Design a protein with these regions (language model features):
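Rossmann-fold NAD(P)-binding glycine/threonine-rich loop
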Residues: 9-16, 24-47, 58
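Flexible, glycine/proline-enriched loop segments at strand-loop-helix junctions
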Residues: 46-51, 140-143
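Short gly/pro/ser/thr-enriched loop/turn and capping motifs at secondary-structure boundaries
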Residues: 28-33, 51-56, 80, 84-86
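Glycine/Thr-rich phosphate-binding loops of Rossmann-like dinucleotide-binding domains
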Residues: 7-8, 87
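Oxidoreductase and adenylate-handling cofactor-binding alpha/beta cores
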Residues: 57-73
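Rossmann-like NAD(P)-binding element
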Residues: 1-7, 22
Length: 178
């Protein structure tokens, strides 16, 4: 696996060489711009196939589809994901097991702006304030964790079929007090 900053170079080479692509990373706008070329070449470029993003999308869609199938409707959507560590494996000061690029774990609070909607109010949280606005999330059987907002939750509104839902937030869990 390559770091995300290298993906566009690899993607362009794969498009030129007619090779399929799979990554665990978010889809940048530059990659969306290649969608027509990828389809015209008969290629499959699959992204967001890690834990988060990835497995979180699949579990969210499974739940949303079941609710819709049973005649329900969503009034709010909040989803948190994280590599929760088994207590017997908690052997480092961070209380965290690196399941992805360690550099990205360290710089997770840097970058652009986290975007989400809460009770009908759009929220924009600069990354330098990300870890100052955590929420406590209880996971039965595992305890309390800190949750913080993930990047741009709003771009998943269409993908999840959530239209004008008043609350849409995707977040990350970390050990309390991380």
């Amino acid at each position: 696996m390559l770091p995300a900053f290298m993906h566009m170079d690899v993607v362009k080479d794969c498009l030129r060489l007619k090779k399929h692509v799979i990554t665990p990373s978010y889809v940048p706008d530059a990659l969306w711009a290649l969608d027509g070329e990828v389809k015209a070449a008969g290629l499959i470029f699959l992204n967001e196939l890690g834990l988060d993003p990835g497995i979180d999308h699949m579990s969210a869609m499974r739940i949303l589809d079941r609710i819709r199938r049973e005649g329900g409707r969503m009034e709010a959507f909040e989803s948190y994901c994280g590599g929760l560590i088994a207590p017997e494996s908690d052997t480092n000061p961070w209380g965290y097991k690196f399941t992805w690029n360690p550099r990205n774990v360290v710089i997770a609070g840097q970058g652009g702006m986290a975007r989400y909607i809460k009770d009908g109010e759009y929220k924009y949280l600069p990354y330098h304030r990300l870890f100052q606005q955590t929420v406590r999330v209880s996971v039965p059987g595992f305890g309390e964790f800190d949750g913080y907002v993930n990047r741009d939750s709003l771009k998943y509104r269409k993908h999840y079929g959530l239209g004008e839902i008043p609350t849409l937030l995707r977040g990350t869990l970390r050990k309390a007090g991380f």
